[in-house]
Amino acid sequence: MLQPARRKFRKEQKGRNTGVATRGNSVAFGDFGLKCTDRGRLTARQIEAARRAISRHVKRGGRIWIRVFPDKPISTKPAEVRMGNGKGNPEYYVAEIQPGKIVFEIVGVPEELAREAFRLAAAKLPLRTTFVARQLGA
């Protein structure tokens, strides 16, 4: 699963996920992409599950790019522990997603196969997504 090799600080503040994606909002590497239209978080497990769904559907064909990386640690406290006594330990990593962000790209497969692969992947993700194709001249 994806996670940073090392971080300067183990824990991070919650922050706010605002605005729309100004970077990573167009198909750059492949011919087709899966674009998020919702705001939210994708965990490393969700990204990996979606990647497996795409890989299994296209079999050996095509090349897949993951355009997001889960670099934000989310900490939780154990069950039935009283409040206070500091912040909990990092449990998993998430990628913050703004509307318009391309999550996956694929090349080397027909459009119908790519569309079906992304439909299967979208079922693994908690956000609404749409299928996009590379714009000519872009």
From Swiss-Prot:
Function: Binds 23S rRNA and is also seen to make contacts with the A and possibly P site tRNAs.
GO cellular component, one term: cytosolic large ribosomal subunit
GO MF assignments: rRNA binding; structural constituent of ribosome; tRNA binding
Name of a matching Pfam family: Ribosomal_L16
Organism placement in taxonomy: Bacteria, Pseudomonadati, Pseudomonadota, Betaproteobacteria, Burkholderiales
Family named by the database record: Belongs to the universal ribosomal protein uL16 family.
Keywords: Ribonucleoprotein, Ribosomal protein, RNA-binding, rRNA-binding, tRNA-binding
Biased composition (Basic residues): 1-13
Gene name of the encoded protein: rplP
Subunit description: Part of the 50S ribosomal subunit.
Disordered: annotated segments: 1-22
Protein name (Swiss-Prot/TrEMBL): Large ribosomal subunit protein uL16
Native organism: Variovorax paradoxus (strain S110)
GO annotation, biological process: translation
InterPro entries xref list: Ribosomal_uL16 (IPR047873), Ribosomal_uL16_bact-type (IPR000114), Ribosomal_uL16_CS (IPR020798), Ribosomal_uL16_dom (IPR016180), Ribosomal_uL16_sf (IPR036920)
